C-alpha cells in the first residue's frame, strides 16, 4: 500500500486510540448483521439469529478482537502486507474457503465503525488513508486465491 507520510501519520495516530476489543467485536458483528450470508463461516459461534444476538455473542467479540489484532500487525508492515498476511490468506483460501469479497466488506465495515467511534476526528483525509489500508489488507488476504 502506498501511503504518503501524512496518511501514515493519520492512520497510526488514530489507531493508537482504537480499543481493539471493542472495535473488533463491533466490526465483525456488523459484518454478520449487514451481510448475513457471511454467517455461514461462523456456524460454530452459537446464536446468530438476531442482530442483538450477533452483537452480544462472546465468540463474535473474541474473533473480532483476533481479526483486529492481525490488522494491527498489518499496520506495522504496510510495505509488506502480502508477506504479513500470507499465512492467513492461505488459511482462508485453502481451509476455510472464504469468499475474498468478504475481506473487502469487512474493511468497509471497519471504516464505518471507526467513523462512528471517532466522529469529527475521522476526517475525510483519515478516511481516505484507512480506505487505502483496508483495500491493501483485503488484497493481501485474497492473494493466495486462484
UniProtKB/Swiss-Prot annotation:
Residues binding heme b are 63, 92
Protein's GO biological process:
hydrogen peroxide catabolic process
Residue numbers bearing the Phosphothreonine modification: 12
Modified residue Phosphoserine is at which positions? 44
UniProt cross-references to Gene3D superfamilies, sorted A to Z:
Globins (1.10.490.10)
UniProt keywords (A-Z) are: Acetylation, Heme, Iron, Metal-binding, Oxygen transport, Phosphoprotein, S-nitrosylation, Transport
Q: In which tissues has expression of this protein been reported?
A: Red blood cells.
Q: Where is the PTM S-nitrosocysteine found along the chain?
A: 93
Q: Name one GO molecular function term.
A: organic acid binding
Pinpoint the Globin domain residues: 2-146
At which residues is N6-acetyllysine found?
59, 82, 144
- Assembly and interaction partners: Heterotetramer of two alpha chains and two beta chains.
| PANTHER family, A to Z | HEMOGLOBIN FAMILY MEMBER, HEMOGLOBIN SUBUNIT BETA
Protein name according to UniProt: Hemoglobin subunit beta
Taxonomic source organism: Mico argentatus (Silvery marmoset)
- Gene name? HBB
